[in-house]
């Protein structure tokens, strides 16, 4: 299985001769942008601050948590995502009751629109909140955004009444997302990840848990995982870096370092000797669709700031671009072998501890065998015979245009 990706990599390397010089010093690290202020507080919180003059008089705030649905216990299925919702429903400095405005109404009085400039997402391995396009003319607005980050970090109220109100919101979101394809994807997890924590970790969770979990369960998750050693603050914009750093240190000074913190485990995905095969059906999914994964070990984080890693990522990107161009040309023929097809390299479905080359294809009702055969043949053709110089120049031009 691994030979297919390696062959595609080599096929690009033959065209990109200069990369052989780049890879001669594979472990050389790329320098950190000297304009980024990086620091760590005594409680373990890491921060990154950078001045960026464009757009003028605007700043972006992020708090990233190295936690997601993979860390839930069975009785907490869906609570990582539920907690993300609760972060907008009352905090220490923005209670959202008779004593003061909540985060959403306060932000909207400053032109920061919920869902556009004020948002968050929960994935399997991380949860990220952002306040974007914040005007900097009024320093009190900037200071208040720091307080919002502080409250998300350690001071979400999680009041009983607000939890019960949010159950209905989550139920509606669950209902609207509960498509046939999502049901198939969820059902496939136990096959893709046998005997693994990844076998049941979709962020939307279990509707039974959402309806019935005791209040303390979400408070336990919050206390266990939302902690400074697993959090990072990113602030970028038209700001004075020294002033923002000093304010951040002051605002987050009362956030305590955890005592005997739980280990943040990154769960492995086992290799398999024989192919893992899942076949699923759903009345809402009318046309067949096939995904084929070629797994390999993920790149360690310690290597992701090296020249070799970035060179490799570029070559993989070129290989995927050129292979997708070929698949797209086949789709546009008079009698295409599929209705859609693509190739992509990245995380193995939900898992970040395994990577995979993914080949996808969809077809008419009776055409899935031909669709699968064709995408496999095209990938193998590229592995054996490589790509042409003209294909590479086209892919390179697309890449440079996207970067610009």
Residue ranges and their predicted role:
Residues 260-327, 360:
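His/Glu-based metal-binding/catalytic segments typifying zinc-dependent metallopeptidases
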Residues 90, 131-166, 330, 348-404:
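M16/insulysin-pitrilysin zinc metalloprotease superfamily fold
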Residues 60-132, 183-184, 200-206, 321-355:
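M16/MPP (pitrilysin/insulinase) zinc-metallopeptidase core fold and M16-derived inactive scaffolds
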Residues 25-37, 129-132, 139, 147, ...:
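Histidine-acidic residue clusters that define the catalytic metal-binding segment
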Residues 195, 232-291, 397, 401-403:
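An aromatic/glycine/proline-enriched structural segment found at the starts
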Residues 167, 181, 216-250:
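Non-catalytic, conformational "gating/processing" segments within enzyme and secreted inhibitor domains
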Residues 1-26:
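Bacterial Sec-dependent N-terminal signal peptides
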Residues 99-105, 157-175, 186, 240, ...:
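Acidic/histidine-enriched alpha-helical segments
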